[in-house]
Amino acid sequence: MHLLIPAAGMGRRMGSDRNKLRLMLHGKPLLAWTLLAAESSISISWIGIIGQLEDEPTWETLLNTLSLNKPVVFIEGGQTRQESVYNGLQALPPEAEQVLIHDGARCLATPELLDRCAHALHKYQGFVAAVPVKDTIKVVDTTHQIQGTPDRSQLWAAQTPQGFQVVPLKKCHEQGRQQGWEVTDDAALFEKLDLPVHIVVGEETNLKVTTPADLAIAELILEQRLQKNSQTDGFGS
């Protein structure tokens, strides 16, 4: 399975002017934990890091430190996540038939989640890892007056990985560029073309590290995970 990792996000909500994936989590950059999960995944065989050129030396140093056994390539990103994933798709090896796309900021995803998602592509054209929404959601207007309350049983919070068959995803991206569509994830492109996208159950701990509070929570989760795995080898040891 081929894995693309968009890794160009800035840390403005972290109060930082640099790539947030360079921030440290338990002694390693955020991106390191994503890469270690991919390394420990049974299914992942190829990894593409999509980032800005200014970060390439940092990621090269990180890769030398981690000494991963799987091939990892650097792919120059675009101005938006959508453009970056498009560039990533063009850089896939010719034999790639399926792809997982996983945000580098979701650095607590486990190898088991990656494997479960890879297996889902035996059955689906496209899918999104997601978890059921726990909170009651309110729809509001521009004045913050509540307009409605959706049925919570039908609401899922989208995560990554998202996975797709490569050929239809490339077609979706090409049409999106032609039509000028701007979307926040790849599943939305599938949806615009009425292609089926399914849900694969994600992980509650698979949070996206965006704010200082997220980073603090991630530290606690990772510390517990490391303690639990302290007697084993592999991811998290």
UniProtKB/Swiss-Prot annotation:
CDD domains: CDP-ME_synthetase. GO terms for biological process: isopentenyl diphosphate biosynthetic process, methylerythritol 4-phosphate pathway. It comes from the Bacteria. Its EC number is 2.7.7.60. It catalyses: 2-C-methyl-D-erythritol 4-phosphate + CTP + H(+) = 4-CDP-2-C-methyl-D-erythritol + diphosphate. GO terms for molecular function: 2-C-methyl-D-erythritol 4-phosphate cytidylyltransferase activity. SUPFAM superfamilies: Nucleotide-diphospho-sugar transferases (SSF53448). The record marks R13, K20 as: Transition state stabilizer. It holds the Pfam family IspD. Keywords: Isoprene biosynthesis, Nucleotidyltransferase, Transferase. The record marks R152, K208 as: Positions MEP for the nucleophilic attack. Pathway: Isoprenoid biosynthesis; isopentenyl diphosphate biosynthesis via DXP pathway; isopentenyl diphosphate from 1-deoxy-D-xylulose 5-phosphate: step 2/6. Gene3D superfamilies: Spore Coat Polysaccharide Biosynthesis Protein SpsA, Chain A (3.90.550.10). Catalyzes the formation of 4-diphosphocytidyl-2-C-methyl-D-erythritol from CTP and 2-C-methyl-D-erythritol 4-phosphate (MEP). Belongs to the IspD/TarI cytidylyltransferase family. IspD subfamily. This is 2-C-methyl-D-erythritol 4-phosphate cytidylyltransferase. It comes from Acaryochloris marina (strain MBIC 11017).
